[in-house]
């Protein structure tokens, strides 16, 4: 899948963001991560080709049990659905 990478000095965790380009909460999560200098990768699912969209849906369903955006996965084990600042801070140690 074509993820985009945002560099940051806070790179102790692998952070993956599944988002939609038009989603306000998705934009807030990306900005929160940038503001805290967190390195992360993201994909705007709505901008992908149909085959990629299907793979994203399968991956989200298997990892989070839902198809909600935004979904953040930290270190392939912590799943945060929605913009939950306190959960993000705890998972990232910031």
PLM regions and their residue ranges:
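Local sequence-structure signature of Cys/Sec-based thiol-disulfide redox active-site neighborhoods
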Residues: 2-41
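Short alpha-helical
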Residues: 24-25, 51, 86-87
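Thioredoxin-like thiol-disulfide oxidoreductase module
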Residues: 45-66, 93-94
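A short, hydrophobic beta-strand/beta-hairpin element that forms part of a small beta-sheet core
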Residues: 70-79
